[in-house]
C-alpha cells in the first residue's frame, strides 16, 4: 500500500503546468493570475483575478475605472466569464461598477441566467455588495471633452483594447474571461462582442478556448470565438484555427476588410496561439511562471 507521502508526490507529478494567454500588453493581468495559480487556484478564479487587475488600474482606459466613455460622457462596461464546465455569466451596459467581471461571475454562480444588462445588471451588482463608483476619471473626462470639439469617429483600433484571458490550470481545466469599456465615444447603449458567449469568448474544456478583441460588430457576425474552438475540434492547432477564422472574414470582404480583429486561442494540450487581420497584435503568454510579450503580424500586413 503506497504511503500518503508518495500519494501526494504522485498528485504533484500528475499536475499540469498552468498556461495563460492574454490579449494585448496587460502584465498586471497575467501577474494576478499567476498568484492564484501558484496557490493551486482554479482557472476560473485566475481568469477573474486577471481581469480585475486591469479593471482596477485607473491609468488603463480600456476596462473598469478610467475607461473612455460613450458619446454622452458615460462609462458603460461589458464583461463575461466561462468556466471549464460550460457555465457562463455575462453583463453588458453596466454603469458605476468597477469590476464587471466579478458581477458576471456572480451571474454565473448565483443565478439561473447567463446575461444581465443595464439597470438590471446594476441592481443585481448592488444587491451582491458591489459599490456604486464614479468610473469617469480626470484623464478619461479630459479625453472625452477634447473629442467633443470635433466628434471625429474613433475606431476600436484607435482607442480600445479588450482584456481577454484564457487560462489552463494545474488540473488541465480551461476557463476564460473578457472585460472592456467598449468602443470609445460609442453611441449610448452600444454593446460589442466582449460580453457575448460565442463571440468574444468561448470555452469547451474537451477542445480548448478562444477569445477576441477588435471591432466587436464583425466578431459577432461570425461568432468568432466559437468558430475558432470548432476549428480546433476539427484538428486545427490554435494558430491555424485563429488564422482560418480570420480568412473567412477576409473572404467576405473581398480580401480587404478595413478594420482590425484579433483572436487568441488555447488547446486542451496547453498549446496557445494568436492571429490578427492587420498591423500587429501584442499578447502575453505565461508558461512555467514566466511571462513573455509576443506579437504576431497581421495577415494583411
Where are these regions (language model features)?
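Alpha/propeptide regions of enzymes that mature by internal proteolysis
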Residues: 2-301
Amino acid at each position: 500500500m503506497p504511503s500518503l507521502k508518495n500519494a501526494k508526490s504522485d498528485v504533484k507529478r500528475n499536475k499540469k503546468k498552468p498556461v495563460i494567454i492574454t490579449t494585448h500588453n496587460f502584465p498586471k493581468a497575467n501577474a494576478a493570475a499567476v498568484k492564484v495559480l501558484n496557490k493551486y487556484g482554479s482557472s476560473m478564479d485566475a481568469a477573474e483575478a486577471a481581469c480585475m487587475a486591469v479593471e482596477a488600474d485607473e491609468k488603463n482606459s480600456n476596462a473598469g475605472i478610467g475607461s473612455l466613455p460613450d458619446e454622452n460622457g458615460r462609462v458603460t462596461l461589458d464583461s463575461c466569464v466561462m468556466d471549464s464546465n460550460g457555465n457562463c455569466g455575462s453583463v453588458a451596459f453596466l454603469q458605476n461598477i468597477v469590476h464587471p467581471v466579478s458581477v458576471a461571475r456572480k451571474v454565473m454562480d448565483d443565478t439561473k441566467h447567463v446575461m444581465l444588462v443595464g439597470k438590471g445588471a446594476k441592481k443585481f451588482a448592488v444587491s451582491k455588495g458591489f459599490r456604486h463608483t464614479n468610473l469617469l476619471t480626470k484623464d478619461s473626462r479630459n479625453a472625452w471633452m477634447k473629442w467633443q470639439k470635433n466628434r471625429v469617429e474613433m475606431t476600436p483600433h484607435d482607442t480600445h483594447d479588450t482584456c481577454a484571458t484564457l487560462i489552463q490550470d494545474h488540473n488541465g481545466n480551461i476557463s476564460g474571461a473578457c472585460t472592456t469599456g467598449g468602443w470609445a465615444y460609442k453611441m449610448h447603449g452600444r454593446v460589442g462582442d466582449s460580453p457575448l458567449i460565442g463571440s468574444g469568448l468561448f470555452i469547451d474544456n474537451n477542445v480548448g478556448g478562444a477569445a477576441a478583441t477588435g471591432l466587436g460588430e464583425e466578431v459577432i457576425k461570425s461568432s468568432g470565438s466559437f468558430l475558432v474552438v470548432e476549428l480546433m475540434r476539427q484538428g486545427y492547432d490554435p494558430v491555424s484555427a485563429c488564422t482560418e477564422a480570420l480568412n473567412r472574414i477576409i473572404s467576405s470582404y473581398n480580401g480587404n476588410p478595413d478594420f482590425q480583429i484579433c483572436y487568441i486561442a488555447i488547446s486542451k494540450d496547453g498549446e496557445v496561439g494568436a492571429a490578427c487581420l492587420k498591423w500587429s497584435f501584442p499578447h502575453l503568454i505565461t508558461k512555467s511562471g514566466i511571462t513573455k510579450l509576443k506579437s504576431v503580424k497581421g495577415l494583411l500586413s
